[in-house]
Amino acid sequence: MYKYEYLPPYFLQNGVTMTTYTALWANRDWESKTTHPEPEYHEVIFTGGQGVPIFGKVAIPPNAHSTIVGTYGITGELDQQWFLRILGRKAYAQGYAVVLFDWRAHGKTAELSPTLTSDGLYEGEDFVRIAETAAKMGCPSPFWFTGYSLGGQLALWGVKAAADLAPKDINIAGGAVICPSLDSFRSLTYLVTHPFGKYIESRIAKELKKLAWKIHAVYPESMQPEAIERANSIWGFDEELVIARLGFATVADYYQASSGLELLPKLSKPTLILYAADDPLFDPAIIPDLEVAATKNPDIDLLLTRYGGHVGYVSSKKCQNQYEDPDQWWAWNRVLEWIETSRSQKIENGSMQKSKV
Protein backbone atom coordinates (compact mmCIF):
# COMPACT_ATOMS: atom_id res chain seq x y z
CA MET A 1 0.00 0.00 0.00
CA TYR A 2 2.74 2.43 0.93
CA LYS A 3 4.89 3.85 -1.78
CA TYR A 4 8.02 4.45 0.26
CA GLU A 5 9.77 2.73 3.15
CA TYR A 6 10.29 4.97 6.16
CA LEU A 7 10.95 3.76 9.68
CA PRO A 8 10.95 5.94 12.80
CA PRO A 9 12.30 4.83 16.19
CA TYR A 10 9.99 2.27 17.78
CA PHE A 11 8.54 4.70 20.34
CA LEU A 12 7.53 7.09 17.55
CA GLN A 13 5.58 4.57 15.47
CA ASN A 14 2.35 6.37 16.29
CA GLY A 15 1.09 9.56 14.67
CA VAL A 16 0.07 11.34 17.86
CA THR A 17 3.32 10.43 19.60
CA MET A 18 5.45 11.54 16.65
CA THR A 19 3.56 14.82 16.31
CA THR A 20 3.82 15.55 20.03
CA TYR A 21 7.51 14.63 20.12
CA THR A 22 8.29 16.90 17.18
CA ALA A 23 6.37 19.83 18.63
CA LEU A 24 7.58 19.59 22.23
CA TRP A 25 10.99 17.88 22.23
CA ALA A 26 12.66 17.83 18.81
CA ASN A 27 12.70 21.63 18.72
CA ARG A 28 14.92 21.72 21.82
CA ASP A 29 17.98 20.01 20.41
CA TRP A 30 17.55 20.21 16.65
CA GLU A 31 20.82 22.10 16.18
CA SER A 32 22.78 19.25 17.72
CA LYS A 33 21.12 16.93 15.18
CA THR A 34 22.30 18.91 12.15
CA THR A 35 25.76 18.88 10.60
CA HIS A 36 25.70 22.22 8.80
CA PRO A 37 25.92 25.78 10.15
CA GLU A 38 23.30 28.50 9.69
CA PRO A 39 23.74 30.36 6.39
CA GLU A 40 24.35 34.09 6.48
CA TYR A 41 20.91 35.41 5.54
CA HIS A 42 20.11 38.89 4.30
CA GLU A 43 16.73 40.37 5.16
CA VAL A 44 14.59 41.42 2.21
CA ILE A 45 11.15 42.94 1.82
CA PHE A 46 9.61 41.41 -1.27
CA THR A 47 6.52 42.62 -3.10
CA GLY A 48 4.01 39.82 -3.43
CA GLY A 49 0.74 39.60 -5.32
CA GLN A 50 -1.50 42.68 -5.20
CA GLY A 51 1.50 44.70 -4.02
CA VAL A 52 1.52 43.09 -0.55
CA PRO A 53 4.92 43.46 1.18
CA ILE A 54 6.42 40.14 2.27
CA PHE A 55 9.32 39.81 4.70
CA GLY A 56 11.93 37.23 3.85
CA LYS A 57 15.52 36.14 4.16
CA VAL A 58 17.93 35.22 1.37
CA ALA A 59 21.21 33.29 1.42
CA ILE A 60 23.21 32.62 -1.75
CA PRO A 61 26.19 30.23 -1.52
CA PRO A 62 29.23 30.52 -3.79
CA ASN A 63 28.55 28.90 -7.16
CA ALA A 64 24.86 28.37 -6.40
CA HIS A 65 23.19 26.17 -9.00
CA SER A 66 19.47 26.68 -8.23
CA THR A 67 17.09 28.11 -5.63
CA ILE A 68 14.61 26.82 -3.06
CA VAL A 69 11.82 29.12 -1.84
CA GLY A 70 9.95 28.03 1.28
CA THR A 71 7.58 28.95 4.07
CA TYR A 72 5.91 27.31 7.08
CA GLY A 73 2.53 26.31 8.51
CA ILE A 74 -0.59 27.87 9.97
CA THR A 75 1.00 29.80 12.87
CA GLY A 76 4.37 31.14 13.94
CA GLU A 77 7.05 33.35 12.45
CA LEU A 78 10.25 32.81 10.56
CA ASP A 79 12.70 33.02 13.45
CA GLN A 80 10.75 30.33 15.35
CA GLN A 81 10.64 27.89 12.45
CA TRP A 82 13.44 25.51 13.35
CA PHE A 83 12.16 22.86 10.95
CA LEU A 84 12.40 25.32 8.06
CA ARG A 85 15.84 26.42 9.22
CA ILE A 86 17.01 22.82 8.96
CA LEU A 87 16.06 22.90 5.29
CA GLY A 88 17.92 26.19 4.89
CA ARG A 89 21.11 24.72 6.34
CA LYS A 90 20.95 21.51 4.35
CA ALA A 91 20.01 23.16 1.05
CA TYR A 92 22.64 25.90 1.34
CA ALA A 93 25.33 23.29 2.04
CA GLN A 94 24.28 21.48 -1.16
CA GLY A 95 24.65 24.59 -3.31
CA TYR A 96 21.11 25.92 -3.34
CA ALA A 97 20.30 29.57 -2.83
CA VAL A 98 17.68 29.70 -0.07
CA VAL A 99 14.73 32.08 0.24
CA LEU A 100 12.54 31.76 3.35
CA PHE A 101 9.62 34.07 4.08
CA ASP A 102 6.90 35.04 6.54
CA TRP A 103 3.69 34.49 4.61
CA ARG A 104 0.70 36.81 4.73
CA ALA A 105 -0.37 37.94 8.23
CA HIS A 106 2.59 36.16 9.85
CA GLY A 107 5.75 37.35 11.56
CA LYS A 108 7.28 40.53 10.22
CA THR A 109 5.01 40.44 7.18
CA ALA A 110 2.10 41.09 9.57
CA GLU A 111 3.88 44.28 10.66
CA LEU A 112 4.20 45.47 7.07
CA SER A 113 0.57 45.00 5.99
CA PRO A 114 -2.87 44.22 7.47
CA THR A 115 -3.55 41.81 4.60
CA LEU A 116 -4.88 38.55 6.01
CA THR A 117 -4.39 34.96 4.91
CA SER A 118 -6.07 33.39 1.89
CA ASP A 119 -4.80 29.79 2.24
CA GLY A 120 -3.10 29.87 -1.15
CA LEU A 121 -5.53 31.81 -3.32
CA TYR A 122 -3.16 34.79 -3.32
CA GLU A 123 -0.10 33.30 -1.62
CA GLY A 124 0.53 31.29 -4.78
CA GLU A 125 1.33 34.49 -6.63
CA ASP A 126 3.46 35.60 -3.68
CA PHE A 127 5.75 32.63 -4.30
CA VAL A 128 6.13 33.61 -7.95
CA ARG A 129 6.81 37.30 -7.24
CA ILE A 130 9.33 36.39 -4.55
CA ALA A 131 11.15 34.14 -7.03
CA GLU A 132 11.10 36.94 -9.59
CA THR A 133 12.76 39.37 -7.18
CA ALA A 134 15.17 36.74 -5.87
CA ALA A 135 16.33 36.07 -9.43
CA LYS A 136 17.20 39.75 -9.83
CA MET A 137 19.23 39.49 -6.62
CA GLY A 138 21.33 36.70 -8.10
CA CYS A 139 19.43 33.58 -7.05
CA PRO A 140 19.83 31.17 -9.97
CA SER A 141 17.17 29.20 -11.82
CA PRO A 142 15.67 26.69 -11.60
CA PHE A 143 13.46 27.62 -8.65
CA TRP A 144 11.71 25.06 -6.44
CA PHE A 145 8.86 25.89 -4.05
CA THR A 146 8.41 24.13 -0.73
CA GLY A 147 6.46 24.25 2.52
CA TYR A 148 4.91 22.02 5.15
CA SER A 149 1.44 21.72 6.70
CA LEU A 150 -0.61 24.73 5.54
CA GLY A 151 2.60 26.09 4.05
CA GLY A 152 2.62 23.00 1.85
CA GLN A 153 -0.79 23.97 0.52
CA LEU A 154 0.55 27.47 -0.19
CA ALA A 155 3.51 26.01 -2.08
CA LEU A 156 1.15 23.88 -4.19
CA TRP A 157 -0.69 27.04 -5.12
CA GLY A 158 2.70 28.54 -5.94
CA VAL A 159 3.42 25.70 -8.37
CA LYS A 160 0.03 26.30 -10.01
CA ALA A 161 0.59 30.07 -10.16
CA ALA A 162 4.04 29.58 -11.69
CA ALA A 163 2.52 27.95 -14.76
CA ASP A 164 0.31 31.00 -15.29
CA LEU A 165 2.32 33.96 -14.00
CA ALA A 166 6.05 33.27 -14.05
CA PRO A 167 8.13 35.45 -16.39
CA LYS A 168 9.61 33.52 -19.29
CA ASP A 169 13.17 34.27 -18.21
CA ILE A 170 12.71 32.51 -14.85
CA ASN A 171 12.53 28.74 -14.68
CA ILE A 172 10.22 27.69 -11.86
CA ALA A 173 10.73 23.96 -12.08
CA GLY A 174 8.23 22.61 -9.54
CA GLY A 175 7.66 22.01 -5.86
CA ALA A 176 8.05 19.59 -2.97
CA VAL A 177 5.79 19.64 0.10
CA ILE A 178 5.60 17.82 3.43
CA CYS A 179 2.26 16.89 5.03
CA PRO A 180 0.34 19.56 3.10
CA SER A 181 -3.14 20.59 4.14
CA LEU A 182 -5.37 19.34 1.34
CA ASP A 183 -8.95 19.57 2.58
CA SER A 184 -9.52 22.03 5.42
CA PHE A 185 -13.24 21.32 5.67
CA ARG A 186 -12.87 17.59 6.22
CA SER A 187 -9.77 17.87 8.39
CA LEU A 188 -11.17 20.51 10.74
CA THR A 189 -14.35 18.49 11.12
CA TYR A 190 -12.26 15.41 11.87
CA LEU A 191 -9.84 17.24 14.18
CA VAL A 192 -12.40 18.23 16.79
CA THR A 193 -13.83 14.71 17.14
CA HIS A 194 -11.06 13.41 19.41
CA PRO A 195 -9.24 14.82 22.47
CA PHE A 196 -5.81 15.30 20.88
CA GLY A 197 -7.37 17.05 17.90
CA LYS A 198 -9.44 19.32 20.11
CA TYR A 199 -6.31 20.30 22.03
CA ILE A 200 -4.35 21.07 18.86
CA GLU A 201 -7.25 23.01 17.34
CA SER A 202 -7.59 25.07 20.51
CA ARG A 203 -3.88 25.89 20.58
CA ILE A 204 -3.89 26.94 16.93
CA ALA A 205 -7.01 29.06 17.44
CA LYS A 206 -5.38 30.90 20.34
CA GLU A 207 -2.32 31.64 18.21
CA LEU A 208 -4.52 32.92 15.39
CA LYS A 209 -6.30 35.24 17.81
CA LYS A 210 -2.93 36.55 19.03
CA LEU A 211 -2.02 37.14 15.41
CA ALA A 212 -5.20 39.12 14.83
CA TRP A 213 -4.57 41.29 17.89
CA LYS A 214 -1.01 41.89 16.72
CA ILE A 215 -2.23 43.16 13.36
CA HIS A 216 -4.95 45.22 15.05
CA ALA A 217 -2.34 46.90 17.25
CA VAL A 218 -0.45 48.11 14.18
CA TYR A 219 -3.48 48.64 11.92
CA PRO A 220 -6.46 49.35 14.22
CA GLU A 221 -8.75 50.18 11.30
CA SER A 222 -8.15 46.84 9.63
CA MET A 223 -10.51 44.75 11.78
CA GLN A 224 -13.12 45.14 14.47
CA PRO A 225 -12.14 44.17 18.04
CA GLU A 226 -15.54 42.51 18.48
CA ALA A 227 -14.84 40.23 15.52
CA ILE A 228 -11.47 39.23 16.98
CA GLU A 229 -13.14 38.42 20.30
CA ARG A 230 -15.59 36.12 18.53
CA ALA A 231 -12.83 34.27 16.65
CA ASN A 232 -12.42 31.37 19.09
CA SER A 233 -11.67 28.57 16.65
CA ILE A 234 -9.88 28.11 13.34
CA TRP A 235 -13.24 28.10 11.59
CA GLY A 236 -14.29 31.15 13.61
CA PHE A 237 -11.13 33.04 12.65
CA ASP A 238 -11.86 32.51 8.97
CA GLU A 239 -15.56 33.26 9.43
CA GLU A 240 -15.10 36.48 11.41
CA LEU A 241 -12.00 37.93 9.79
CA VAL A 242 -11.15 36.34 6.46
CA ILE A 243 -13.96 35.25 4.17
CA ALA A 244 -15.77 38.57 3.70
CA ARG A 245 -12.57 40.25 2.50
CA LEU A 246 -12.11 37.50 -0.05
CA GLY A 247 -15.69 37.59 -1.27
CA PHE A 248 -16.93 34.29 0.16
CA ALA A 249 -20.34 33.88 1.77
CA THR A 250 -19.37 30.88 3.91
CA VAL A 251 -16.26 29.26 5.34
CA ALA A 252 -17.16 26.06 3.52
CA ASP A 253 -17.10 27.92 0.19
CA TYR A 254 -13.71 29.38 1.08
CA TYR A 255 -12.25 26.00 1.99
CA GLN A 256 -13.60 24.49 -1.21
CA ALA A 257 -12.03 27.25 -3.32
CA SER A 258 -8.62 27.01 -1.63
CA SER A 259 -8.56 23.20 -1.37
CA GLY A 260 -5.21 21.66 -2.16
CA LEU A 261 -6.90 18.42 -3.17
CA GLU A 262 -8.96 20.18 -5.83
CA LEU A 263 -5.77 21.83 -7.06
CA LEU A 264 -3.80 18.64 -7.71
CA PRO A 265 -5.29 17.83 -11.14
CA LYS A 266 -4.31 21.33 -12.30
CA LEU A 267 -0.61 21.08 -11.46
CA SER A 268 1.58 20.93 -14.56
CA LYS A 269 5.06 21.02 -13.04
CA PRO A 270 6.90 18.23 -11.20
CA THR A 271 5.60 18.08 -7.62
CA LEU A 272 6.60 15.85 -4.73
CA ILE A 273 4.10 15.23 -1.92
CA LEU A 274 5.23 13.52 1.30
CA TYR A 275 2.21 12.38 3.29
CA ALA A 276 1.93 10.20 6.39
CA ALA A 277 -1.02 7.84 6.76
CA ASP A 278 -0.91 8.30 10.55
CA ASP A 279 -1.00 12.12 10.45
CA PRO A 280 -3.41 12.92 13.33
CA LEU A 281 -4.31 16.38 12.06
CA PHE A 282 -5.86 15.29 8.77
CA ASP A 283 -8.91 13.15 8.03
CA PRO A 284 -7.67 9.69 6.93
CA ALA A 285 -10.49 9.61 4.38
CA ILE A 286 -8.48 12.12 2.32
CA ILE A 287 -5.80 9.52 1.55
CA PRO A 288 -7.70 7.51 -1.11
CA ASP A 289 -8.60 10.75 -2.89
CA LEU A 290 -4.97 11.86 -2.74
CA GLU A 291 -3.84 8.55 -4.22
CA VAL A 292 -6.33 8.85 -7.07
CA ALA A 293 -5.28 12.44 -7.81
CA ALA A 294 -1.60 11.49 -7.80
CA THR A 295 -2.20 8.50 -10.06
CA LYS A 296 -4.07 10.62 -12.60
CA ASN A 297 -1.48 13.40 -12.74
CA PRO A 298 1.93 12.26 -14.07
CA ASP A 299 3.55 15.44 -12.71
CA ILE A 300 2.88 14.36 -9.10
CA ASP A 301 5.17 12.03 -7.19
CA LEU A 302 3.44 10.83 -4.01
CA LEU A 303 5.48 9.38 -1.16
CA LEU A 304 2.82 7.95 1.12
CA THR A 305 4.26 6.46 4.29
CA ARG A 306 2.75 4.39 7.06
CA TYR A 307 4.38 6.49 9.79
CA GLY A 308 5.53 10.08 10.12
CA GLY A 309 2.86 11.95 12.05
CA HIS A 310 2.31 15.60 11.21
CA VAL A 311 5.56 17.13 9.94
CA GLY A 312 7.58 14.70 12.02
CA TYR A 313 9.45 12.10 10.01
CA VAL A 314 12.23 11.58 12.54
CA SER A 315 14.04 8.48 11.28
CA SER A 316 15.60 5.61 13.18
CA LYS A 317 19.31 4.78 12.93
CA LYS A 318 18.42 1.78 10.78
CA CYS A 319 16.45 4.01 8.41
CA GLN A 320 19.29 6.55 8.27
CA ASN A 321 21.73 3.80 7.35
CA GLN A 322 19.36 2.41 4.73
CA TYR A 323 19.21 5.74 2.90
CA GLU A 324 22.77 6.79 3.78
CA ASP A 325 21.32 9.93 5.35
CA PRO A 326 23.59 12.19 7.40
CA ASP A 327 20.92 12.83 10.05
CA GLN A 328 17.42 12.00 11.28
CA TRP A 329 15.52 14.52 9.15
CA TRP A 330 14.08 12.00 6.72
CA ALA A 331 11.54 14.27 5.04
CA TRP A 332 14.00 17.04 4.13
CA ASN A 333 16.52 14.45 2.96
CA ARG A 334 13.93 12.99 0.60
CA VAL A 335 12.87 16.45 -0.61
CA LEU A 336 16.45 17.44 -1.44
CA GLU A 337 17.16 14.03 -2.99
CA TRP A 338 14.09 14.35 -5.20
CA ILE A 339 14.92 17.92 -6.25
CA GLU A 340 18.50 16.93 -7.05
CA THR A 341 17.30 13.97 -9.13
CA SER A 342 14.83 16.19 -11.00
CA ARG A 343 17.50 18.84 -11.53
CA SER A 344 20.00 16.31 -12.86
CA GLN A 345 17.42 14.87 -15.25
CA LYS A 346 16.69 18.33 -16.62
CA ILE A 347 20.41 18.99 -17.12
CA GLU A 348 20.81 15.63 -18.86
CA ASN A 349 17.78 16.22 -21.08
CA GLY A 350 19.07 19.68 -21.93
CA SER A 351 22.45 18.26 -22.91
CA MET A 352 20.79 15.64 -25.11
CA GLN A 353 18.73 18.33 -26.83
CA LYS A 354 21.87 20.37 -27.55
CA SER A 355 23.72 17.33 -28.89
CA LYS A 356 20.96 16.77 -31.43
CA VAL A 357 21.26 20.31 -32.81
Regions picked out by a protein language model, each given a short descriptive name:
Residues A294-Y313:
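Catalytic histidine neighborhood in serine/cysteine hydrolases
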Residues T20-N63, Q322:
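N-terminal cap/lid segment of alpha/beta-hydrolase-fold proteins
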Residues G308, S315-V357:
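Catalytic active-site module of serine/aspartate enzymes centered on a nucleophile-bearing elbow/loop
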Residues P280-I286:
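Conserved alpha/beta-hydrolase "acid-adjacent" motif
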Residues T117-M137:
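Alpha/beta-hydrolase active-site loop
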Residues W144-R245:
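Alpha/beta-hydrolase-fold enzymes
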Residues L267, I273-Y275, D279:
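Short beta-strand/loop motif that positions the catalytic acidic residue
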Residues A59-L112:
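Short, surface-exposed "cap/lid" segments of acyl-processing enzymes
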